[in-house]
């Protein structure tokens, strides 16, 4: 230990032990990450009585804190950013390498709660499952699998919020992200169809905030394909609300103006 004001070795009275910051980070993040996972698991869920009746749990929690694994996540994210031509993937990849850990919370085979609420656009849960079965199977090549029951998406949000609150109570910096979750899913670290990552760090300044977007020369990159859709291609039609031109699997029809109605 050194004194921050002088750079000289710190001295302590007999019986007092200075706290080594480097030794503190790992154990604290590990313990708080486990508490966060517990908070996610006990968070309220739609149709919770199904779980007490023996239905399988659909919420997955995975804690990653190994630097080698964090590097694998970062490298995949850079490859994904190259094929989507989006600098934000590179920005998040740089942060991933510097994290003390990541808690992934996701939905695995999230069956509906049988409320027949209609929020998905179908009259019943059974109708939703039947109508979207092939669509879910076809979405394996996308970043996440879908569509997912709307109420289960709400459940995921509640679980993530409970976990984030637990991190805040213990003063561990946490930020909700999806790109790291995509990387974890594609690398087989998690099995969730849809997931959110909570980036964890114990530093003097939160490393996942106030980050600048890097300048990337995409044409100079030679990164392997992630075999994930969509990807950026020249000439792709920018869909309404899209940030970049990504190639959809189904062509997006161009909107045309309706001719003015003739005066009677």
Language model: regions and residue ranges:
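Acidic, surface-exposed loops and disordered segments
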Residues: 2-264
């Amino acid at each position: 230990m050194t004194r921050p004001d002088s750079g000289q070795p710190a001295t302590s009275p007999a019986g007092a032990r200075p706290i080594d910051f480097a030794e503190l980070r790992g154990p604290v993040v590990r313990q708080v990450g486990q508490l966060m996972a517990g908070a996610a698991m006990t968070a309220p869920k739609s149709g919770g009585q199904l779980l007490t009746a023996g239905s399988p749990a659909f919420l997955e929690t995975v804690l990653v804190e190994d630097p080698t694994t964090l590097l694998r996540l970062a490298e995949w994210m850079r490859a994904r950013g190259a094929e989507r031509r989006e600098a934000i993937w590179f920005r998040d990849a740089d942060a991933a390498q510097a994290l003390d850990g990541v808690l992934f919370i996701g939905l695995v085979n999230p069956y509906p709660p049988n409320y027949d609420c209609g929020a998905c656009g179908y009259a019943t849960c059974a109708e939703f499952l039947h109508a979207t079965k092939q669509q879910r199977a076809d979405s394996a090549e996308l970043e996440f699998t879908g569509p997912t029951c709307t109420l289960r998406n709400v459940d995921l949000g509640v679980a993530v919020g409970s976990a984030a609150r637990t991190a805040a109570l213990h003063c561990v910096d946490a930020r909700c992200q999806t790109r790291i979750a995509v990387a974890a899913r594609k690398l087989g670290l998690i099995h969730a169809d849809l997931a959110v990552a909570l980036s964890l760090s114990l530093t003097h300044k939160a490393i996942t905030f106030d980050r600048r977007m890097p300048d990337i020369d995409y044409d100079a990159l030679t990164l392997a394909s992630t075999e994930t859709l969509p990807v950026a291609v020249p000439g792709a039609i920018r869909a309404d609300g899209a940030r970049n031109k990504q190639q959809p699997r189904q062509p997006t029809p161009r909107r045309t103006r309706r001719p003015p109605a003739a005066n009677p």
